[in-house]
Structures are given as structure tokens and as C-alpha cells.
A protein has these predicted regions:
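Residues forming the Rossmann-fold NAD(P)(H) cofactor-binding site
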Residues: 13-15, 94, 132
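NAD(P)H-binding glycine-rich loop region in Rossmannoid oxidoreductase-like domains
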Residues: 35, 44-98, 103-105, 117-121
Length: 307
């Protein structure tokens, strides 16, 4: 296959591109700045063809045709944590994927769209509602598609993952009091392999919605404690203060902590069913803490989050 990976230089996209290339597929990488992107890519991916892609400009079907030329499958691994200038949630998460799906339907290409677990219609975060709007537009487009919803990702090179590891090292863990939801932490390398395997399967109704996660489902507090590997003082941050801080972080573009993520942490974000073992042909990698502790939580935690 010839596969275009949009966002192929990012935390998720790099893993997807590497897994596809390891399986013998021709990988093309869509990036905002191809020359700078080539320098950031690992050596194994530097010979990939790079194509310039600014999703905020690709909001009509015709704008996609040149970018998609010669590709069999398109993987959209682009997302923004916060809006910046022309890069708005509506354009990047909703309008651009809508136009991309229309272009894929027109050209008979398969679209694999990476979204997130826990999206709800009445969420109070534009970050979340724009992602849900994008999902719904893709599902209605007529294109052969798969929407992939991973849980929290662990691995090197991720802004959020690195930030959580840093927080875990603190002797005091400040955890929002309403962050009671469980998260099925998974390795980003497993996500890359799973998406590569998904691309090799025939597009069908069975694979239209794919939820992925690890086999354990800790709360945020449990995850931080296990990552630290030794006891830490836990301070429950009141709801009003956690929300205020999340909005301030959004305004200042400071840290990965956002109001959207706070909303997600309020409810379980676990796959139901979990397609990861089936796609990998094995059990997911264990997420091991610095102290050597492996999460071993009851399987009953892996349930459909309440709406």
C-alpha cells in the first residue's frame, strides 16, 4: 500500500509511519513544514516522501486532491490541544476531516482517523465537541473509514506523557478531586502497530469504530503513584480550583493540562470492547512504572463509560 500519514512527525504519527514501513508499505508523510520535519524524523523514516499539509487551509474537498494523489489509504493523526491563529478546533478537528472524508469518498480511498475515547455531545469543551463533530461527518461521508479511539498514551516523545512523568516524580501529587475516571493506559508503540495492522484489514462495518487501550485501568491518582514507584502525598484539588487552573492553562497555552482533559478525567475512558489484543495478535505491552510496578487492576474496571 501507499499510505499518507498526516501528522507523521508527531507523537502518534511517527509510530504509525514506522510500523507501516516495517511491514513493507510505502509511507508518505504530511507535515506543515516538510524540510524541518525531515530533520526531526528518525533515520528509518527520512527517506519517506514528505508533502506539505496545513489542515486549517484544507476545508473543502477539492483542496485535498493534489495532496492525496497516488495514495491508497490516508491516516489522519493531526490534532491540536489549543487554538492558535487560523488553527481553530472547528477547522482542524471538524471541517478539514469532513473535507478529507469527502475527498476519500470521491477517490475511493480508505480513511483511518485517529480520535479519542470519551467524546460526548454535551461536553462543555470545544476541544471535545469539535472532535465529535469530525467523527460524525466522517461516518456520514460515504468513504470507507475507520475511526480509532485510543486511551491515554505512554511513551517517549509525547508532550503530555512527558509532563505526567514529570508530575509523578514530585513528592506531592495535586490531583483534581473530580478526576475519578479510569484510563486504560497503553503504549504508543502498540497504537502504531495496531493502526498498521488495521490498514491491512479489509474496510468493513466491523472496523468502522475501533476502541483501543491497555489491559489495566488506573485512575489518574493511581497512575501517578505507580509511575513514581514510591509513596507520595496526594492533595485533592477542589473542583472550582481545578477548573480555574485548566482555563488559565488554556489561556496561557501552558502545560498539556486543559479544560478538555479535565472533562475527560471525570469519567471512565476505557475501550469497550478493546480491539487492541485482536489487532496486535498478542496482549498489549504492560505499562511499567519507574519503580518497576506493573498496573494490575480488576478487569471490571474496563466498562463502558457512563454518559
Amino acid at each position: 500500500m501507499r499510505v499518507l500519514v498526516l501528522g507523521g512527525t508527531g507523537f502518534i504519527g511517527r509510530q504509525v509511519a514506522a510500523a507501516l514501513k516495517a511491514r513493507g508499505h510505502a509511507v508518505l508523510i504530511g507535515s506543515r513544514s516538510p524540510e524541518r520535519a525531515r530533520r526531526r524524523l528518525p533515520p528509518a523514516l527520512r527517506d519517506c516522501e514528505l508533502r506539505e499539509a496545513h489542515l486549517e487551509r484544507l476545508t473543502c474537498r477539492g483542496a485535498w486532491h493534489a495532496l492525496l494523489a497516488g495514495c491508497d489509504t490516508v491516516i489522519n493523526a493531526v490534532g491540536i490541544l489549543r487554538e492558535r491563529g487560523a488553527e481553530t478546533y472547528d477547522k482542524v478537528h471538524h471541517r478539514a476531516p469532513t473535507a478529507l472524508a469527502a475527498a476519500c469518498a470521491f477517490g475511493g480511498r480508505r480513511l483511518v482517523h485517529i480520535s479519542a475515547l470519551g467524546l460526548r455531545e454535551h461536553a462543555r469543551s470545544a476541544f471535545l465537541t469539535s472532535k465529535l463533530a469530525g467523527e460524525r461527518a466522517i461516518a456520514a461521508s460515504g468513504a470507507p473509514y475507520s475511526i480509532v479511539r485510543p486511551s491515554l498514551l505512554e511513551g517517549e516523545g509525547g508532550y503530555g506523557a512527558r509532563w505526567l512523568r514529570s508530575l509523578a516524580r514530585w513528592p506531592v501529587h495535586f490531583v483534581p478531586a473530580e478526576a475519578r475516571g479510569r484510563i486504560a493506559v497503553m503504549a504508543v508503540t502498540d497504537l502504531g502497530e495496531a493502526i498498521a495492522a488495521l490498514c491491512e484489514r479489509e474496510a468493513s462495518a466491523e472496523w468502522c469504530e475501533v476502541e483501543l487501550g491497555g489491559t489495566a485501568a488506573p485512575t489518574l491518582a493511581e497512575y501517578l503513584r505507580a509511575r513514581r514507584g514510591r509513596p507520595a502525598l496526594r492533595v485533592a484539588v477542589p473542583r472550582w480550583l481545578a477548573r480555574l487552573v485548566s482555563h488559565l492553562c488554556d489561556l496561557a497555552h501552558f502545560s498539556p493540562f486543559s479544560f478538555g482533559h479535565l472533562e475527560l478525567l471525570r469519567r471512565d475512558n476505557v475501550p469497550c470492547p478493546n480491539a487492541l489484543p485482536r489487532l496486535l495478535g498478542r496482549e498489549p505491552l504492560a505499562v511499567v512504572a519507574r519503580g518497576g510496578e506493573v498496573f494490575d487492576l480488576p478487569a471490571v474496571a474496563l466498562r463502558r463509560p457512563a454518559l
